[in-house]
């Protein structure tokens, strides 16, 4: 592992932050009701993972391409996940912006808004041979995907017909 600025990390963070900043003004109706019931442990893990991932992707230059090798396939896979993440957001912003839209699957990926960026981080960690980012990505995934799955479960539970 080599310290140094990662422009790939910066690009990934921009791809994460820009749609989330737009989302802050386009949250689905009722989102706050779900957010106030979030599991505190999952929220803690999510926040720790977010902070660690944000720092780690910027400070290791190993995430930048270093010439051609088959290892670039890991980086390409991470980039594909991020492009799919952007497409997920485009679909959400063009939708009715409901809770169902927000917690929907995309291309068969469940709760895509949480799963795709976490998967991208894990693939980037493998590409950069960075165990710190791998651990941070796992922590982020447990928290972020866990929260989204809980919200999705609540949402699906509300839609079940009464017997």
Which residues fall in each region the model found?
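Juxtamembrane helix-loop boundaries in multi-pass membrane proteins
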Residues: 34-49, 98-117
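Hydrophobic alpha-helical membrane segments
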Residues: 80-89, 103-129, 135-144
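Core segments of transmembrane alpha-helices
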Residues: 47-61, 78, 82, 112-119
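Membrane-helix exit/interface motif
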Residues: 56-66, 87-95
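Membrane-interface helix-loop junction between the first two transmembrane segments
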Residues: 21-38
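Transmembrane alpha-helical segments that form the membrane-embedded catalytic/substrate-channel core
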Residues: 15-26, 82-93, 145-150
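A cytosolic-side transmembrane-helix exit/cap motif
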Residues: 30, 92-102, 151-163
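Helix-coil boundary and interhelical linker segments in multi-pass alpha-helical membrane proteins
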Residues: 1-10, 58-74, 123-134
């Amino acid at each position: 592992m080599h310290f140094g600025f990662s422009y790939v990390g910066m690009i990934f963070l921009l791809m994460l932050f820009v749609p989330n900043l737009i989302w802050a003004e386009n949250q689905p109706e009722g989102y706050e009701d779900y957010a106030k019931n979030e599991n505190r442990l999952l929220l803690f893990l999510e926040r720790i993972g977010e902070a660690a991932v944000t720092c780690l992707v910027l400070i290791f230059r190993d995430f930048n391409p270093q010439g051609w090798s088959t290892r670039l396939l890991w980086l390409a896979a991470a980039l594909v996940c991020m492009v799919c993440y952007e497409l997920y957001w485009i679909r959400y912003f063009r939708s009715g912006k409901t809770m169902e839209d927000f917690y929907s699957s995309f291309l068969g990926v469940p709760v895509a808004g949480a799963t795709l960026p976490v998967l991208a981080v894990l693939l980037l960690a493998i590409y950069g041979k960075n165990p710190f980012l791998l651990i941070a990505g796992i922590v982020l995934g447990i928290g972020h995907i866990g929260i989204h799955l809980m919200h999705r479960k609540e949402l699906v539970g509300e839609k079940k017909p009464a017997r």
